[in-house]
Amino acid sequence: MIKTKNLKKNYKSLQVLNGLDLNISKSEIVSIVGASGAGKTSLLQILGTLDKPSNKDCELIIDDIEVLGMSEKDLCNFRNTKIGFIFQFHQLLPEFTAIENVCLPAFIKKTNRIDVIKRANELLCYLNLEDKINNKPSELSGGEQQRVAVARALINNPQIIFADEPSGNLDTTSAENLYKLFFDIRDKYNTTFIIVTHNQKLADLADRKIEIIDGDIN
């Protein structure tokens, strides 16, 4: 599903990633851990095509496609079709309702409006938010807001979801429920998850845990 070879990243003189080789299988849930500044988020952003490696002699293959040579337009279309994102701060638009927030990526993709609304309703019901569909983010708890963000990440049927500290803003119970939800989604949709987290207990629940130390995989 995802393969990297000799992936490097530096910010001026600071080397963040030191030539990483990585293989992630379809439907695998992988956690990425490490100290602050170790390179976790930099790796996640490159894998998610939000950033590019610093070196040219590297590979990033997603779903058998080498993505580093894509034009910006093709890469944007690829990202919107294949990939979903979940962040610590859900980034829901406050002026829109839950279902409107969920629908946005599919509207950008120009999917049929009726089909989008139907799927958004199905996802919100699946995530036990059927009675919150028309609520705005300010009317939802932190855990509910994050579940809306999960539904938004799923709206385009992505093969891969990248999550950057998705439970960092949640209490312990909500965080554990969120991780259980990831496994349920994987089992239902065969989705691959790559999760950056500081929470070692939750990281240990993943199929595989990758530790980044000073830009290298331990």
Regions found by a protein language model. Give the residues of each.
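Conserved ABC ATPase signature
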Residues: 136-146
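A short, proline-enriched helix->beta-strand linker immediately N-terminal to the Walker B motif
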Residues: 155-159
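Short coil-to-helix segment of the ABC ATPase nucleotide-binding domain corresponding to the Q-loop/switch region
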Residues: 96-105
